[in-house]
Amino acid sequence: HCGDVPYGYENNYVDDYGLTSRFDIYDALIEKLKAAEPYMYKVGEGGLNGERITRTFVDGLIGKMALYAGGYQTIRTDMPELYGSVQFETLSTDAKRKCAYARRSDYKNYYTIAEDYLQKALSTNAGTTKLVTTDERSYANNPFQRHFQYGMDLLMSPEAIFEIGCVQNQATSRMYCYDFGRGSNGGNNTAPNKVFAGIRMVPSFYYGGYDNADKRRDVSAVV
């Protein structure tokens, strides 16, 4: 049941955590982002590019969460109080797995939010982001590949709204994703050669960092 997880930062002990409705979580996060969004830089403003969280990215994130909140999804039927006053339109149910495939009845409100903020991300708040539709390399003339070549050249593509840097030879005291699960040192003749040939996560903290009874554990890593 993706989404119905413990939520909140004020709890200190495992026993203090219970499940929270995904719809309550969506509503809380959407409202927090909507409050912060007007005060943020767009991509290209304040020296920020797609390696930093910007107003452009937040607009897209609000839109994406609103689509998830209003879309069809599996919901639990074994905890009737979990979703509070939220009403649903149900397509099917599964008594064995105690779930239903449904969407909330007021889904249009969320689709309106999604349309509004996704449009902002693509227009008024797009900043310097743009689709790569041309290729200045006469020998290639492949705009699709040009987008990915920016990454291979250790540059940020103008299409990138937000991404975490994951490249070779970037010295830092912090742990970026290049440090996790790499099968080589990133040399040109050994995969992955520079970026994105194979990014994996080794969730050692998943196995050893949580009490088995801690309900946060299973949603803290993709195994």
Regions found by a protein language model. Name each.
Residues 1, 12-55:
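Conserved, well-structured interaction surfaces
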Residues 10-18, 47, 94-104:
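Short helix/strand-bridging catalytic loops that position acidic/His residues to coordinate divalent metals
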Residues 5, 26, 34-35, 52-59, ...:
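An aromatic- and glycine-enriched ligand-binding surface/loop that stacks and positions planar moieties
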